[in-house]
Amino acid sequence: MNQQWNQYIQIIKQVVKPALGCTEPIAAAYAAAVAKRELGCQTPDTIEVRVSDNLFKNSMGVYVPGTGKIGLKIAASVGALAGDPNAELEVLAKINQDDVTAAQQLIDEERVSVARIDTQELIFCSVTMSAGEDTVSVTISGGHTNIIQITRNGVVTFDAPQQQRVATGSVCEGVDISIKQIYDFALQAPFDDIKFILQAAELNSSLAQEGIDRGYGLEIGRTLKGNIEQGLLGNDLMSRIQMMTSAASDARMGGATLPAMSNFGSGNQGIAATMPVVIAAEAFQSSEEHLARALIMSHLGAIYIKSYYPPLSAFCGNTVTSAAASMALVYLAGGTFEQSCYAIQNVISDSSGMVCDGAKSSCAMKVCTSATTAVRSYLMAMGNHSVKNQGIIGDEVEQTIRNVGSMVRLGMPYTDKSIIDIMSA
């Protein structure tokens, strides 16, 4: 396998990871778990959490898995008391109710505080923890588990090299990559080298079933299932993709203690890149190899498109993630590369106006909307219908992707500030 394809695999493995719970509060839980390990105490006296505006925004309304509670305070507190510092995004996988009770007691005793800080970093979390005369600070920046510095009593004990301080959004920087190259890689790479991506299907399908079996969040998946059973909706490809994709997001945002396979630091975007592809593969009776190739196309395509703008912004990343999923649906249906590009163009034209107003249970509605667009756009593409040279949609797909990046980077920072101000009022 050539060096370029090896780079693609490393990119996927770097940003497509299992994650338990919404990754923004989990970043605080992880930092707290590491701080507790470095401090070497049983129970800290105080925990101070400082975060960027965007990390704060995405932690305000989402349940922390295994706790039944919302917010950064409980995430940091339970992470400090019972988190596994070696588990990264699955830091809270082994907590129990006693841990949650003890964590809530720390909060009730006003020993846990959270503050927003002014920083240019979109993903930033610093946890300072004290016990007796000792104080430890752990700082995460650029990625949800990317620790850049640890200090103990003011002395730096770990300082990440400069290359480790780059943000998740720069994973494609300096890499020769395009939609055509992603398509060719997905179709031609040796199956043994890419079959690891099938874990995404396993994890996110289990999460979807959890969302169907139990009531989480707005119960969108369960509602759609009931409508199908009543005959109000057809039991067809569109309805099943809507049902299972939103069910996975219901469980994810509702605090289920099952991991999602994330994409670009987002569990919901991992779901959006995975579940439409999995359900379509079942409908088309695709082989395991075809499913793996479609998932590679969807996940790497999503990573590539999102590399043109910051990982946290006012733009809902499920939209362009679903564009990559739609591309993969065309592949599974036997379409051409040109039709795959049509699908991407159609999705971005349809749903690129969706904003991110924080992580919460209603994100499952946006995931469902994006998945719906992915299916409709794939169907249009298979009929050789594509948006072109309208609005932000360029003459070809690479220009459209660059246009999305420009819109988010240059046009949406003020929107982001306005959303955060509204949510914080």
Curated annotation (Swiss-Prot):
Residue ranges the record marks as coiled coil: none
Gene Ontology biological-process entries: L-cysteine catabolic process to pyruvate
Domain of life: Bacteria
GO molecular-function term, one example from the UniProt record: L-cysteine desulfhydrase activity
Any Pfam family the entry gives: SDH_alpha
Family, per entry: Belongs to the UPF0597 family.
PANTHER family (UniProt xref): UPF0597 PROTEIN YHAM (PTHR30501:SF2)
Protein's name according to its UniProt entry: UPF0597 protein VIBHAR_03081
Natural source organism: Vibrio campbellii (strain ATCC BAA-1116)
